[in-house]
């Protein structure tokens, strides 16, 4: 994946996150600032999904933990085999919102 494809891929991920949260009626606010996408929950807690361009990785941080994902086999996968979308669902649940991204 080249840099342009990397950015396009992550921007699609961010768009899908925002669309699914809205469609499923989650009480959250989404904001993008440069390479950082933030989901803020009603209690002001946050999930941060950000680009790590030098590594071509996608990072996720929340009170459920921190994860680093690389794009392999057409999906974002952590080194331990966890999938991005599953980790994001678990993180949202830890912040009080049940949402499905599949």
From Swiss-Prot:
Q: What are the recorded GO MF terms, alphabetically?
A: ferric iron binding; ferrous iron binding
Family, per the entry?
A: Belongs to the frataxin family.
The record's Gene Ontology biological-process terms are:
iron-sulfur cluster assembly
Instruction: Sum up the protein's function in the record's words.
Output: Involved in iron-sulfur (Fe-S) cluster assembly. May act as a regulator of Fe-S biogenesis.
Give the gene that encodes this protein. Answer: cyaY
- Give the matching SMART domains: Frataxin_Cyay
Q: What is this protein called?
A: Iron-sulfur cluster assembly protein CyaY
Which Pfam families does this entry report, sorted A to Z?
A: Frataxin_Cyay
Q: Entry's NCBIfam families?
A: FeS_CyaY (TIGR03421)
Q: Which residues form a coiled coil?
A: none
**InterPro entries assigned:** CyaY, Frataxin/CyaY, Frataxin/CyaY_sf, Frataxin_CS
For this UniProt entry, what's an example GO CC term?
A: cytosol
Which species does this protein come from? Histophilus somni (strain 129Pt)
Q: Keywords assigned by UniProt?
A: Iron, Metal-binding
């Amino acid at each position: 994946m080249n840099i342009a494809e990397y950015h396009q891929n992550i921007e699609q991920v961010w768009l899908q996150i925002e669309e699914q949260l809205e469609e499923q009626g989650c009480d959250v606010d989404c904001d993008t600032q440069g390479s950082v996408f933030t989901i803020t929950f009603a209690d002001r807690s946050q999930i941060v999904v950000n680009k790590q361009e030098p590594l071509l990785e996608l990072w996720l941080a929340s009170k459920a933990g921190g994860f680093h994902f690389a794009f392999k086999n057409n999906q974002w996968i952590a080194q331990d085999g966890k999938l991005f979308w599953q980790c994001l669902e678990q993180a949202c649940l830890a912040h009080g919102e049940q949402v499905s991204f599949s």
